[in-house]
Swiss-Prot record:
Signal sequence extent: none
UniProt domain ABC transmembrane type-1: residue ranges: 83-311
GO molecular function: phosphate transmembrane transporter activity
CDD domains: TM_PBP2
Primary subcellular site in the record, as a coarse category: membrane
This protein's encoding gene: pstC
Provenance organism: Xylella fastidiosa (strain Temecula1 / ATCC 700964)
Protein name: Phosphate transport system permease protein PstC
Any single GO BP term: phosphate ion transport
Amino acid sequence: MTSTLIPKETSTPGGRDLRDARADYFFKLLLTAAVAFVLIALVSAALSMLWGGRQALQLQGVSFFYSTEWNPVENKYGALTPIYGTIVTALIAMLIAMPVSLGIAFFLTEVAPRWLRTPIGTAIELLAGIPSIIYGMWGLFVLVPVMTDYITPFLNDHIGTLPLIGTLFQGPPLGIGTLTAGFVLAIMVIPFISSMMREVFLTVPTQLKESAYALGSTKWEVSWNIVLPYTRSAVIGGMFLGLGRALGETMAVAFVIGNSVRLSPSLLTPGTTIAALIANDFGEATETYRSALLLLGFVLFIVTFAVLVIARLMLLRLSRKEGN
């Protein structure tokens, strides 16, 4: 009789469980290290800027954050003007970009024929990848002359004479200024926000939209009453991500804002932002001036972080209302 050879088991169930447990442990360790690296980098960046700005903080005290005087020759530094410019340009950009981005996303998902959706969507995604310096050069050589010859005179003549808001639109026809920087920022963030919203709108179940169309709803009614409420949380999150990007933009703004550290209520006069001021002056700054710029960087970090925290809190509140 021939005996059947039974192969010897090279591993036991207990040994395999031990290897799986070890692999799972190292996997968790790797993920924990990745998260810890991000947190350490975030805290280190903030603390390094705060430590670098300690000299300016000791020199100016708390007045650094609310003073409008910026005079490196006399070692007087007030951050209110660049903070104001940063917030105002970002808000102008979002006021323009949000409705335009919503319109583009609705067009690509609800209105455009199928053969047109892919090329337009691809073009928008390509626009989102263009370097910011290209937008800045376009703004300087194309948008600034248009602002000088047409838009600024029109605003001065028709809106600058109105009560309350007229002060915002009075100024010399220089072309460069806070409003121009807001326009350039809007053009930059529109592809980013519209691409995000388009992907979000595609997650709406087809059955919901088809049911609404079957009841006689128009495309506008479906978009406004079905698509937008269904994706409201994601839309708000995308809006705040776009705002965070606008707050930190540097080169495009530096080309067209005028780089003047003088606080003015007019949107047509030159101004500056935190990022633009740091980019323009950091290379040639003295020790004290460099300390003030580092402290400005810390302020920008706090502003951007606060915006993202507010966005997160709003999303949590919305999710609780929706029962999630």
